[in-house]
Amino acid sequence: MLLLSGSVLLMASSLAWSAEFSASFKGTDIQEFINTVSKNLNKTVIIDPSVSGTITVRSYDMMNEEQYYQFFLSVLDVYGFTVIPMDNNVLKIIRSKDAKSTSMPLATDRQPGIGDEVVTRVVPVNNVAARDFGRSSRELNDNAWRGTCGDYEPANVVVMTGRAGVIHAVMTIVERVDQTGDRNVTTIPLSYASSTEVVKMVNELNKMDEKSALPGMLTANVVADERTNSAAGFGEPNSRQRVIDMVKQLDRQQAVQGNTKVIYLKYAKAADLVEVLTGVGDSIQTDQQNALPALRKDISIKAHEQTNSLIVNAAPDIMRDLEQVIAQLDIRRPQVLVEAIIAEVQDADGMNLGVQWANKNAGVTQFTNTGLPITTMMAGADQFRRDGTLGTAATTALGGFNGIAAGFYQGNWGMLMTALSSNSKNDILATPSIVTLDNMEATFNVGQEVPVLAGSQTTSGDNVFQTVERKTVGIKLKVKPQINEGDSVLLEIEQEVSSVADAASSSSTNLGATFNTRTVNNAVLVSSGDTVVVGGLLDKSTNESANKVPLLGDIPVLGYLFRSNSTETKKRNLMLFIRPSIIRDRSQFQSASASKYHSFSAEENKQRNVSNGEGGLLDNDLLRLPEGGNAYTFRQVQSSIVAFYPAGGK
């Protein structure tokens, strides 16, 4: 290429020497242009191998060194090349599209860079989020030159790379936008309305205005201060004033009107809810202790048991809270069917054998544990010889004796042998069941009242007065179920099975009956429909006793004539089971009732073994049940009653 002109003019002035340049190139190789400029500016250049081509440019005015350098940068920029300043007065010339991947000088306030010089600048943002500038800054930088722009959220800064002039223009825009917003707060005390309710309404109105798509800085917000019953508004002045006006319009005294409602309950008991609702109302009033007197109003809650309803008098906002509580409490509560099984087997064997001797002159060997003393029987025999009667003592002794007694009474000698073998077996199988509401205690008792001698007193006329009490024996079941999550039931159980012991197990001291009692008091967690053992006992006991005459009673074989032996063995097996079933709706309740009824009907038919067409009450003798909507159930009950009674209806 031909270098047409590349002159350097040095001109002198009266004050100082300065260098001025004039440039005119036509069809000149770009590398020749770079070499000429670098020589004039006394710069060392490093040219990328990809830099090639020709340029044509002409300057008609003289330029100083700074202007000449900017002219150099602008020419290269037009032809798609970029100058990267390096240390030691070195310039690196590369293609503009490769500039993003190379290191560039970091511009600061003292050295911001000028013109088309490529630099990197970090711009801090103080009042808004840096990411909000990312899109706009990136578009400006890309349009001016294919630079880069990004944001770093942890430090809230914008990082830009590009021409120094473009970056300076973008920074000016950022500084103008990054201004502190008007965040003044205005507090509005309320005299009549509740701050919470007013703020809720104002915020709802503001949500409706969001359709206008106003920027966030042009909107106002309002919050409630329940402690002082006031509202605080903040934001853009015009929007804040609009919010203040709305709050003042809503804070007006209302005309006196009735705040009494009658609420009819569907499931809950009105009297039970009064205490709960009164506590809730008192809690709401406590939260408003620092509110204005106009907001503090008395709450009255009464129950009308005849209609199962509540009469509530309260302020409108408190009334709404109470109605929500009532709606959550007045629900259909699930029920629990609790079935218990008591299975007990008792087996007792006893043997009592004794021999007693007596001599009117020498003495007696007597064993009172036999229940028949020889002295009493000899006295009765003497009286029988005299007047033909046994006497009261002998008659009483024989009346309370069980077993066999044999002996002789001749002259002064008498002998009495007693023997008793006893065996008792007691089987108990009981299946009490009861249905109760969740968290409601229920009691089931089946038994009888047994007289028990409590005390006796003998008067001066030898009259005996006895005090008798009644003790209930049988089956007692008390449960309180609590339904937990996942169909599990927490059961608080009090279960008792009691009975009167048989005569062989009772004391012979005539102090009254002996009672067998089995009691369980515990709490178990059971899944609905599962059967668990809540208690059990396996017991075996053997009692052996011997009363004998010293020395004589130890003689082999003959020793049995001078002693009394007693042996008793008892075995007992007791198990207590329980099964809860949750009943949540009508269909489950009907299913449980039908199952129980059919089980009862089948058991009765099995025990009675009533043949078809035999006996029973006549149809016209039966108590007529209304056949309204369930004829099938009526027919089932009718057939069961007929099967229960014997033939002839008696």
From Swiss-Prot:
- Could you name the Gene Ontology cellular component terms for this entry? cell outer membrane; type II protein secretion system complex
Biological processes, Gene Ontology terms: protein secretion by the type II secretion system
Q: Where is this region: N0?
A: 20-115
Q: Per UniProt, which keywords does this protein have? A: Cell outer membrane, Membrane, Protein transport, Signal, Transmembrane, Transmembrane beta strand, Transport
Signal sequence extent: 1-18
- InterPro entries linked: Bact_Secretion_Sys_Channel (IPR050810), GspD-like_N0 (IPR049371), GspD/PilQ (IPR001775), NolW-like (IPR005644), NolW-like_sf (IPR038591), T2SS/T3SS_dom (IPR004846), T2SS_GspD (IPR013356), T2SS_GspD_CS (IPR004845)
| Highest taxon of source | Bacteria
Specify where the region named N1 lies, as residue ranges: 117-181
- For the region N2, what residue ranges are annotated? 182-255
Q: Where is this site: May serve as a pivot that allows opening of the central gate for substrate egress?
A: G447
Q: Where in the cell is it found?
A: Cell outer membrane
- The segment annotated N3 runs over 258-330
Q: Which Pfam families match?
A: Secretin, Secretin_N, type_II_gspD_N0
Q: Give the start-end ranges of region Secretin.
A: 335-585
Region S domain: what ranges? 587-650
Q: What does this protein do?
A: Involved in a type II secretion system (T2SS, formerly general secretion pathway, GSP) for the export of proteins. Required for the translocation of the multiple pectic enzymes. This subunit forms the outer membrane channel.
Instruction: Supply the domain comment.
Output: The N0, N1, N2 and N3 domains are periplasmic, while the secretin and S domains form a channel that is partially inserted in the outer membrane. The N1, N2 and N3 domains each form a periplasmic ring. The secretin domain forms a double beta-barrel structure; the outer barrel has a diameter of about 110 Angstroms while the inner barrel forms the central gate with a small pore in the closed state.
Subunit structure of this entry?
A: Forms a cylindrical channel with 15 subunits.
The UniProt family comment states: Belongs to the bacterial secretin family. GSP D subfamily.
Q: Which named protein is this?
A: Secretin OutD
Which organism is this entry from? Answer: Pectobacterium carotovorum subsp. carotovorum
